[in-house]
Structures are given as structure tokens and as C-alpha cells.
């Protein structure tokens, strides 16, 4: 299925069937991003976010030592020893549960140790979901050294912790449980700045 777009105030507002599409952030920028409108507006006590990415980003701020960092609110935790190879597609799923406070990252089918992060907390208010930028403030606070520089696809977000079998399916490019907050195959979004959308068939996952 195709993409329906209108142009308003120099901004493309799209409602897209994104299956088979990839978003490219081709330059380091503090403006280029994709804003995603969530399908649910609620208080979140658990989440799973999955995506696939490819990049050759390797700066001092991202030393390429298998390190990933997850934030819930203003608290973060590092996960180590996971795949981060340059110019390779990586499938990533992140889970967090408020009840137990446990967070985990899966990369290319490999699960991290589960670590404590913000037990009893919640994610309240309208979610501000941005692809390509790190938000140091709600819907803003972008810095070029925090920006994503590369390709991204298959973004899904659920309001629950997916099971290991569901995550393993995702790692095999099988979407057994599409996101009910963000579903890459059917989401409303807007592109800002230098952002390109192409067919994933031009690349190798």
C-alpha cells in the first residue's frame, strides 16, 4: 500500500503503511527527526520498544564497546557486551516493567542481564516519540552529538513487556505482535529536516 501525504507549512504530514520502508538520517544534525503520533495516550507501567538500525556512528560519546543505555525519566542504566558492529543491521528490543523495576535489552537475539530501573515509576502524559534525536526536554532539547545518524526501520512500541518468544520472532523479522502504541506498518508521523524514506529492498537486513 502507498503513502498518503499533504504538504502544509513546508512539513510533510503522512499516514503511511510503512511495511518495507526504511527511514534514513543521512547527516549529523540537531534538527532532522521523525515525530510519531502514538496510537494510545495513557499512563504506561510497562513498555516494549523494538526497532532495527544500521549506522557507522562511532564517536567518543558512543565508543562502540557493546554499550547501550536506557533511560526511564531522568534515571538511566547501562547494558554491556551486546552487538554494536558498524554498517550492520541490528535488531533491538527494550523492555521495562514498573512493578518489578526490571529492564532488559535484546540485540540480534541476544538478551542482556535484567537490571533495576525506576521500580514503581510510570510514564505519564502524552508520549513524545521522536526518531533520530535524543530529547533532553519534552519534544525538544536536541544536540547534534546525541543525534542518530543512519538507517532505521520496523519500529514498534507496546504497552506491555513482550515474551521472550515474541521478541525472538521479531529478531527473525517476524512481527507476531505489532505495537499497539506505535505500529510501523500503520502509523501517523511527520518528517522534519533532512530525512529520506526509501524501500528496505534497497538494503540487506
Model-inferred region functions:
Residues 1-205:
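Extracellular glycan-associated modules
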Amino acid at each position: 500500500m502507498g503513502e498518503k501525504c499533504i504538504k502544509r507549512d513546508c512539513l510533510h504530514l503522512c499516514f503511511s503503511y510503512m511495511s518495507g520502508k526504511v527511514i534514513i538520517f543521512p547527516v549529523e544534525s540537531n534538527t532532522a527527526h521523525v515525530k510519531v503520533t502514538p496510537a494510545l495516550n495513557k499512563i504506561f507501567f510497562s513498555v516494549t520498544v523494538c526497532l532495527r538500525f544500521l549506522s557507522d556512528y562511532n564517536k567518543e560519546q558512543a565508543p562502540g564497546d557493546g554499550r547501550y543505555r536506557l533511560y526511564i525519566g531522568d534515571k538511566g542504566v547501562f547494558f554491556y557486551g551486546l552487538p554494536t558492529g558498524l554498517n550492520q543491521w541490528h535488531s533491538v528490543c527494550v523492555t521495562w516493567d514498573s512493578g518489578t523495576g526490571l529492564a532488559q535489552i535484546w540485540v540480534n537475539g541476544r538478551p542482556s542481564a535484567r537490571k533495576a530501573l525506576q521500580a514503581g515509576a510510570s510514564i505519564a502524559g502524552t508520549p513524545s516519540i521522536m526518531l533520530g534525536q535524543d530529547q533532553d526536554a519534552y519534544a525538544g532539547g536536541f544536540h547534534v552529538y546525541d543525534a542518530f545518524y543512519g538507517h532505521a526501520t520496523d519500529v514498534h512500541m507496546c504497552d506491555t513487556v513482550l515474551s521472550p518468544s515474541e521478541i525472538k520472532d521479531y529478531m527473525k523479522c517476524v512481527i507476531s505482535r505489532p505495537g499497539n502504541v506505535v505500529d510501523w506498518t500503520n502509523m501517523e508521523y511527520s518528517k522534519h529536516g533532512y530525512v529520506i524514506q526509501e524501500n528496505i529492498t534497497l538494503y540487506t537486513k
